[in-house]
Amino acid sequence: RFACEDTPEVKQMILDINAQVPEAAKGLHEESIIIDQCNFSFESYSWNLAESGITALAITSMDTKADAGVAIRYLADDISTIHHNADHMLLVEKPDDILRAKDENKVGIILGSQNCEFLHHNDLDATVYLFHKLGMRIIMPAYNHRSFAADGCYQSANAGLSNDGKKLIAALQKYGVTVDLSHVGERSTLDALEMAEKPMIFSHSNPKKYVDH
């Protein structure tokens, strides 16, 4: 299931709202590549995912406190769901897969995490390589609080990246895992951006001037 409740009343309400959307807006939506950058768990393909018309869905595959073993189990669950819904979904492993999802009228699933603790190891290059091979394509260096790599946005010390954090950022970029800086503290964010060799994202954030979180 997704964010909306799967009941007849909710379904009808959403369909009624969508029916009021102007045809020009519907056309723009249909021809555009639409990526939902922040979603949580999912169980199967459903009517509300079809109705959304999105091209790709970035999934937070695991709990923010998951260790490596738990993370692998969560990833296996998500990949199993994709495989069991292969007529409607595909795993996004490279940018062209998003274009392929659009062409094939499927939803591309991007596997990600809003923390990095499951990667903690004396060889971060190796663990990033491993989880990239398992399909992960978006990882956040910290979620609100301090991780081994960075300070989150709720951490009053507001420290920058740790030494391991710098190794993590380097490895993520090396293997093509997108760095997501939502929930990351200001100094850690700026440190990461200083290291940026590839685009980094703020998947669900806003400009500080607009709302200072």
Where is each model-derived feature located?
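Histidine/acidic residue-rich metal-binding segments in metalloenzymes
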Residues: 26-27, 123-133, 154-201, 213
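N-terminal hydrophobic targeting/anchoring segments and the immediately downstream early-domain regions
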Residues: 1-141, 147-157, 210-212
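Histidine-centered catalytic micro-motifs
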Residues: 34-41, 184, 202-205
